[in-house]
Amino acid sequence: MTEAMKITLSTQPADARWGDKATYSINNDGITLHLNGKDDSGLIQRAARKIDGLGIKHVQLTGAGWDVERSWAFWQGYKGPKGSRKVEWPDLDDEKRKELDNRLTIIDWVRDTINAPAEELGPEQLAQRAVDLLCSVACDHVSYRITKGEDLREQNYMGLHTVGRGSDRAPVLLALDYNPTGDKDAPVYACLVGKGITFDSGGYSIKQSAFMDSMKSDMGGAATVTGALAFAITRGLNKRVKLYLCCADNLISGNAFKLGDIIHYRNGKNVEVMNTDAEGRLVLADGLIDASAQKPELIIDAATLTGAAKTALGNDYHALFSFDDALAGRLLASAAEENEPFWRLPLAEFHRNQLPSNFAELNNTGSAAYPAGASTAAGFLSHFVENYQQGWLHIDCSATYRKAPVEQWSAGATGLGVRTIANLLTA
């Protein structure tokens, strides 16, 4: 390994020779990042991306000014999907170093899992990886059940079974119980539900290649809520939380579901399929039914659900939907504390009624007359949350993954959202 490049911080502007807007400069001692007090974390992250682009793979963060947040900002920009990198971290006290180490372990797990090729990460592998992560932080308090294939149909998990039956890799439901109380009858404080589509071709409503090439990341919601639970545990979560991951491939075959099919759910709802590429909501519905049955104070679902959310917010913000204004405010406050970008989008009672079907109670996609696709998708999900007006948050994970590098991120997964959800769980 080469000698580490030293990275220091300064509140002084760079020498004029580097230009008026220089964020870093190079000298015989290493690289200096020049902070301006406006968005120091963002500046550090962007500078780290540039340093990685120079081919520097071994750095030492040294000198005054390096704390947990600045160290983490550097790593967010420095980490990439190819090759290895080594960072010698600054001196931190034990508590702060533990916080940094937990971020490195858990959020890197989220990023690496989302970046994994679909060939390596099928529905069952995703569920098992989630179990392994959570057992690594709290195995004594974790129990779980994996239901897959025809067992899903027999137990009436019809959304998940319908979407996943077209693949040779069986669909899977992971139901995991984190119960630190030791009381098997303890109330469930929160349920987390994640969309785990390990590859989304669109089914018979097939995607073009330009929209399919990143669909290994369509399990980003499942990875995010798994990481959030693990991270909350490391921060001292002492309440019972259940995790439901709805994992499947959405592929084309002679056994794949088709337009016009009607899915009959356990809560009595019937859904006509008019777009097989609107499959995420169909699998989440099963998880939300189970979550509602637990009568928790809080239900959070996370999913890379709609292109409409990305159209509205790009890849820079996660979209938040809720009927519960107070709860939405709490999540946005958690996001602000963790310096993670969330933006609330509209969800009103009328969005629940913008999914008309001629043959069933609901359609799985809105018609051209109702173009607010992210809001109607959230409205669809609300039909599977028993008390949807209170205690439920839906996160459309538009900031989970980037197809191409930008100035602050490499291509691939970001890990954004993990800390915010963990913060809310432990508040």
Swiss-Prot record:
Residues annotated to bind Mn(2+) 2: K195, D200, D218, E279
Q: Name one GO biological process term.
A: proteolysis
Q: Which reaction does it catalyse?
A: Release of an N-terminal amino acid, Xaa, from a peptide or arylamide. Xaa is preferably Glu or Asp but may be other amino acids, including Leu, Met, His, Cys and Gln
What detail does the entry give on cofactor binding?
Binds 2 manganese ions per subunit.
**How would you classify this enzyme at the top EC level?**
hydrolase
What GO CC terms are in its UniProt record?
A: cytoplasm
What is an example of a Pfam family matching this protein?
Answer: Peptidase_M17
The family database entries (InterPro entries) matched by this protein are listed as: Leucine_aapep/pepB, M17_PepB-like_N, Pept_M17_PepB, Peptidase_M17_C
Compartments (UniProt record): Cytoplasm
Q: What is its EC number?
A: 3.4.11.23
- What does the UniProt keyword field contain? Aminopeptidase, Cytoplasm, Hydrolase, Manganese, Metal-binding, Protease
* Residues that bind Mn(2+) 1: D200, D277, E279
So where's the catalytic machinery, residue-wise?
Answer: K207, R281
Query: Which cofactors does the annotated protein need, by name?
Result: Mn(2+)
List, in alphabetical order, the Gene Ontology terms for molecular function in this entry.
Answer: manganese ion binding; metalloaminopeptidase activity
Family designation: Belongs to the peptidase M17 family.
Q: What's the stated role of this polypeptide?
A: Probably plays an important role in intracellular peptide degradation.
Q: Tell me, how does this one assemble?
A: Homohexamer.
Supply the name of the protein. Answer: Peptidase B
